[in-house]
């Protein structure tokens, strides 16, 4: 059944996003790409070969916002199948490990001579989140639904295994 949707050359990847909370607000980054309007996402990006989910969440947060953090757990796992692309989306809770302020970082996947895709980093209250286009929408809905419990992860991440 699933093999019917797979195509030679299909792009497959795992994206890891970080939920960072401060005083009831979530940290978001705004992207702008040449082929679409600006949109908001949780800080995150593609899992690199040999990298664990916790390592990716912490690395991406540091690259995009300058914040250092420790991994707290997995909140959500989603899956997206679109023409030519299959993405597993992992949303992880991380806890800042210092006093630093979030600053606009960079996306190392963007060529140095290209226009940056990261445009803004901002703390957003739950009330503000309702009016923002946060992608994917399924994550936005869950973040709003779970706002009252402080986005505490369940014990579902079993860790990496060597074999």
Residue ranges and their predicted role:
Residues 10-12, 38, 86-88:
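Residue-level preference for beta-strand/loop junctions
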Residues 1-17:
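Acidic, metal-coordinating catalytic segment for phosphate/diphosphate chemistry
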Residues 6, 75-81:
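Short, solvent-exposed loop/turn elements at beta->coil junctions and helix N-caps
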Residues 18, 74, 92-94:
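A structural signal for short, well-ordered beta-strand segments
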